[in-house]
């Protein structure tokens, strides 16, 4: 089978397999070619190729095997090839658009992967850049030069006029933030990026520049204290900076619930509906709290449809993946997955250090590298606790008139946290945690099996034991089924190397550290 024969059939299979929006945005525009006997799928840039490979390569390979197209697996690279039309299916009819009214039959929607970038509808060609284009540029960290003011320099104004202008600007800004409920401190400039939030931050900036298009809704989830509120409010602040006339509102889901119930009690339901429909961007934090409240969920269902149909941007946060919100209306779960769903991960060591340094800079305090490393190693779970720890150390610095935070000051200010963190951690506790995390038996960790799915967790457990306990290498060996200390040393070195080379293992290790210590 030639590429010209295979690709139109593959397009048909993928069209039937994927949600309509995903196919239209990611698959339909692809071009293909053949280089040195290898079939190639071309993306518009490296970022697009990486996303195609991670999300769709397996599906394309499955179709290739199904059609017995005896070629090696596709490779993905930036470039331009040949565009083929999708193979027709005789008598095929496109499915009708589902009704959006309550009780209507739902359109099946595929669950969104954590790092997938789907679109709810095919985006019509337009002169302006799409959110996908902007996101690709952001991920490549393209520099943006500040715009220079044009025209001749204005005449210097008097101090009184300047003060009046400043006061008026401040009053206008305060009024704007009172209307939007946004915090002026939550901006992209004050956001620290790391592995755990880099993709979400890039997506958020793209949405701020082109709201209501490809990624609607933007659904951000993760544990408490990871910076979800900062990131979503930064979208609102950035949009207002670019479009001061935009109507933006941030709120917690509790406020939405109370607002709806008040409208029901006061018989002002129509006013309530119009109030929320006016916004260009609506941000609701902790949307999971509307679960189990049937009337509230019903009303939000209609509000969601309005935002979707009018291409107004909706941003939601939650502590879990949409599909895992127990008690949430299935129709809402489905619609939450129409846009872009991303997870925020706990900050890695480098990001925690960067957060501390940025906080110190904002507070006008100097922090020594050793002190920043100490605090970052002490507080691993989330950004909120890390900032709280810094605030305590910063307060001690001011009260003691010490402009530089050193490790001794940090230890003194955080001594109660240190005492709590230094609870007795044993090899048995670590072995149990690792076994549960990797879903293997404790007997396997302690046993003689050397298969990869057993040996690697065993080495991770040994390395964690070395880091979190005071046991010697021979004692660690005894705790792991009587192994020789050289075996323990080899395992620890192997894990140290893998943490530098394998991002997935490094993330697993960091999560286990947090689980065991908390």
From Swiss-Prot:
Subcellular location, record wording: Cytoplasm
Binding-site residues for ATP, renumbered to this chain: 225, 227-229
Keywords: ATP-binding, Cytoplasm, DNA replication, DNA-binding, Lipid-binding, Nucleotide-binding
Molecular function via GO: ATP binding; ATP hydrolysis activity; DNA replication origin binding; lipid binding
Compositionally biased intervals (Basic and acidic residues): 164-177
Region (Domain III, AAA+ region): 181-397
CDD domains according to UniProt: AAA, Bac_DnaA_C
Region (Domain IV, binds dsDNA): 398-518
Disordered, as annotated region: 144-180
Gene Ontology cellular-component terms listed: cytoplasm; plasma membrane
Any Gene Ontology biological process: regulation of DNA replication
Region described as Domain II: spans on this chain: 73-180
Positions of the UniProt region annotated as Domain I, interacts with DnaA modulators: 1-73
PANTHER family registered for this protein in UniProt: CHROMOSOMAL REPLICATION INITIATOR PROTEIN DNAA (PTHR30050:SF2)
Reported function: Plays an essential role in the initiation and regulation of chromosomal replication. ATP-DnaA binds to the origin of replication (oriC) to initiate formation of the DNA replication initiation complex once per cell cycle. Binds the DnaA box (a 9 base pair repeat at the origin) and separates the double-stranded (ds)DNA. Forms a right-handed helical filament on oriC DNA; dsDNA binds to the exterior of the filament while single-stranded (ss)DNA is stabiized in the filament's interior.
Family classification: Belongs to the DnaA family.
Subunit structure: Oligomerizes as a right-handed, spiral filament on DNA at oriC.
NCBIfam families (alphabetical): DnaA (TIGR00362)
Domain notes: Domain I is involved in oligomerization and binding regulators, domain II is flexibile and of varying length in different bacteria, domain III forms the AAA+ region, while domain IV binds dsDNA.
Name of the protein in question: Chromosomal replication initiator protein DnaA
